[in-house]
Amino acid sequence: MVYLLSGGTHAGKTLWAQRLMEAKGWPYLSMDHLKMGLIRSGLCPLTPETPDGEMTAFLWPVVREMIKTAVENGQNLIVEGCYLPFNWREDFQPHYLAHIRALWLVFSGDYIQNHYRDILAHADDIEHRLE
């Protein structure tokens, strides 16, 4: 089974992926880590400031094929990041889709207005938790 976790910034994607990894014992792939590895290695023309749409166009083909490989090999995987396209299903045949679950984490406008300080205060919880 492959779980896809995506959503807006500070929505808790990395924390959810970490908790799923701990609960299930499955590996997880952080698209942010992949992005920064490619950028720092000089293997891609992008920068950390590259717009999300361009970043998605660059990273998604690689991640998509990693997902297919995991399904083909009967392996479990958690993929986490904001660079998953909304139309991701279009890239998979039905026999792959049967093994993929997706969850998008989003905040409503009301939630953001009422909890803005809380969101900022917990923005880096996973990084601090692992120190």
Where are these regions (language model features)?
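Walker A (P-loop) ATP-phosphate-binding motif of ABC ATPase nucleotide-binding domains
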Residues: 2
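Hydrophobic anchor at the beta1->P-loop junction of P-loop NTPases
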Residues: 5
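The conserved Walker
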Residues: 8-9
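Conserved glycine(s) of the Walker
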Residues: 12
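Conserved substrate/cofactor phosphate-moiety recognition/catalytic segment
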Residues: 15-62
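Conserved nucleotide-binding/hydrolysis micro-motifs of P-loop NTPases
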Residues: 34-35, 84-85, 107-113
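Glycine-rich phosphate-binding loop used to anchor ATP phosphates in small-molecule kinases
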Residues: 54-104
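A glycine- and Lys/Arg-enriched "phosphate-lid" helix/loop adjacent to the NTP-binding pocket
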Residues: 99-131
